Amino acid sequence: MAPKAVLVGLPGAGKSTIGRRLSKALGVSLLDTDAAIEKQTGRSIADIFAIDGEEEFRRIEEGVVRAALVEHDGVVSLGGGAVTSPGVCAALAGHIVIYLEINAEEAMRRACGSTVRPLLAGPDRAEKFQDLMARRVPLYRRVATIRVDTNCHNLGAVVRYIMARLQAQLATPVSGGDRKSSEAERSGAPLRKSSEVVK
């Protein structure tokens, strides 16, 4: 058993919203790993960060992600920082991983007003967000098999594009390390160097 798709991206990229729409379009369920962590621990993510620290949160998160990749056959939406765990990145190998790309200005507009993102809490949120981008974007690109620009506000177009890419991938199944190469060849783009753009 494996997910139909795994969504990754920065806070504000639309993982939850697009995940719900994509899972509905595919006729499957959505598993949000942040929600799964809160259900498993009986605590909020903010509480885990505040009391136990980020390292403990990432340990819990890795376990939840690994279980989801084995047990869930729908769509899986990962927390924005999940890819900072080497174990998570390793576990994503061989899965269809969709990186929801977003520019800094739009991401900050969507995310920095949130009160439920522990790493963006307090003052200097814009600076903190820029730091998150610098550390995480290379990791998203590394694990992604499909990259989608979500800066446009037409979520329907984003979901339709993802559906088309998933259908193309299912029509030409590839395994493990060959998948990223196959994706790049079909898009006509250099491997991991260009974005799949939705207008």
From Swiss-Prot:
It catalyses: shikimate + ATP = 3-phosphoshikimate + ADP + H(+). One of its GO terms (cellular component) is cytosol. Pfam families: SKI. Residues 174-199 are annotated as: Disordered. Binds 1 Mg(2+) ion per subunit. GO terms for biological process: amino acid biosynthetic process; aromatic amino acid family biosynthetic process; chorismate biosynthetic process. Its cofactor is Mg(2+). ATP binds at G12, A13, G14, K15, S16, T17, R117. InterPro entries: P-loop_NTPase, Shikimate/glucono_kinase, Shikimate_kinase/TSH1, Shikimate_kinase_CS. The keyword ATP-binding applies. PROSITE patterns: SHIKIMATE_KINASE (PS01128). Gene3D superfamilies: P-loop containing nucleotide triphosphate hydrolases (3.40.50.300). GO terms for molecular function: ATP binding; magnesium ion binding; shikimate kinase activity. Substrate binds at D34, R58, G80, R136. Pathway: Metabolic intermediate biosynthesis; chorismate biosynthesis; chorismate from D-erythrose 4-phosphate and phosphoenolpyruvate: step 5/7. Monomer. Belongs to the shikimate kinase family. This is Shikimate kinase. It comes from Mycobacterium leprae (strain TN).
